[in-house]
């Protein structure tokens, strides 16, 4: 039972993000900021590029939830088709981080286990990062229209009030980056926004269906993780590289964890050699991206109403491009 309940504290963090972003959106507190950005760049798409870039590189746990909350303030309330596109943007904008951040275990573990410097790791992974960034930019460019983005320039909100909303959020993100408890930070932030806005029916901002779904997904992921040792032993005994590729992908798909997928990739690299590192990383990363145990697709589906089929089409093309790129850079 304790195993199944592991990591469920994430739900407290998510509820805090939902309440905070819901109050900001319903009161249009960020309208002056987005309006100012729009005046400067003259394009709603460029505002989305900027917001998704900033929220996507936050070195914090639960980045996809924070990013979703911020992007939600740019989406129309009632246009389901427009809103659904932001679930994809949220996903793409927050998952290139695993390919480059020196603060992320997907970079730290290869550096430690394979005795590589950061630049050496990036010498293997930069083609995958380049493809991912290009794909993200193209998705926003091609799939998102100006009409899909809601920036209301007519709303007149005092700059002082906007400051009292923005600075506590920035401070909270700063505390997250510094390593403080995210559950406590966003619980306090949501209480502050409730009092500031006098929106005491805060529970209406919480997506209870999403909370229930994430609870079940986390339970399933925790149960599967009890078989980690079985998967690891099986992989160690693989002598055929192509079978190792298949099983590595499948196990990463089942486990749905960034720590697990990079562990498998590094283990296979130790067995078969450094020239296959980018390939193993790409395969295990791809398995992780589409894993049913991966909470991020659930967040986008329930937060923005993004259909699973839309995720499937976008992610399938992305992982095909990543794997093809990885195969093409293998040094024979």
Where are the regions a protein language model picked out?
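C-terminal transmembrane helix pair
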Residues: 84, 102, 106, 121-134, ...
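Hydrophobic alpha-helical transmembrane segments of multi-pass integral membrane proteins
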Residues: 40-70, 238-288
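Cytoplasmic-side transmembrane-helix entry/capping segments in multi-pass membrane proteins
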Residues: 36-39, 88, 204-214, 265
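Hydrophobic transmembrane alpha-helices of multi-pass small-molecule transporters
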Residues: 1-12, 137-227, 331
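Core transmembrane alpha-helical segments of multi-pass membrane transporters/permeases
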Residues: 2-28, 45-53, 198-230, 237-254
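Alpha-helical transmembrane segments and their membrane-interface exit regions
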Residues: 76, 129-138, 188-198, 286-293
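Membrane-interfacial loop-to-helix junctions in multi-pass transporters
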Residues: 6-10, 36-49, 78-86, 162-163, ...
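Juxtamembrane helix-boundary/capping and inter-helix hinge elements in multi-pass membrane proteins
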Residues: 26-29, 39-43, 73-87, 110-119, ...
């Amino acid at each position: 039972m304790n195993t199944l309940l592991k990591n469920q504290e994430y739900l407290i963090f998510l509820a805090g993000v939902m309440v905070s972003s819901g109050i900001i959106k319903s009161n249009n507190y960020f309208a002056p900021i987005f309006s100012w950005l729009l005046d400067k760049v003259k394009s709603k798409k460029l505002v989305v590029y900027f917001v998704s870039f900033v929220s996507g590189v936050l070195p914090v746990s639960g980045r996809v939830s924070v990013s979703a909350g911020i992007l939600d303030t740019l989406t129309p309330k009632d246009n389901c088709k427009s809103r659904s596109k932001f679930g994809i943007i949220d996903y793409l904008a927050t998952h290139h981080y695993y390919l480059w951040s020196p603060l992320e275990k997907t970079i730290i573990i290869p550096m430690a286990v394979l005795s590589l410097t950061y630049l050496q790791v990036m010498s293997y992974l930069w083609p995958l990062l380049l493809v991912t960034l290009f794909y993200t930019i193209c998705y926003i460019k091609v799939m998102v229209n100006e009409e899909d983005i809601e920036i209301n320039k007519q709303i007149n909100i005092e700059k002082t009030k906007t400051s009292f909303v923005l600075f506590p959020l920035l401070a909270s993100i700063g505390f997250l980056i510094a390593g403080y408890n995210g559950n406590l930070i966003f619980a306090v932030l949501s209480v502050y926004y409730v009092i500031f806005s006098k929106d005491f029916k805060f529970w209406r901002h919480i997506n209870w269906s999403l909370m229930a779904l994430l609870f079940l997904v986390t339970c399933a992921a925790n149960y599967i993780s009890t078989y980690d040792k079985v998967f690891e032993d099986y992989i160690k005994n693989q002598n055929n590289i192509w079978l190792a590729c298949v099983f590595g992908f499948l196990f990463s798909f089942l486990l749905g964890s960034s720590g697990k997928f990079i562990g498998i990739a590094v283990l296979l690299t130790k067995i078969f050699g450094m020239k296959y590192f980018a390939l193993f990383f790409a395969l295990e990363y791809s398995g992780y991206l589409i894993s049913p145990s991966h909470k991020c697709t659930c967040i986008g589906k329930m937060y923005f109403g993004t259909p699973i089929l839309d995720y499937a089409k976008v992610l399938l093309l992305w992982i095909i491009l990543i794997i093809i790129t990885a195969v093409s850079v293998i040094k024979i």
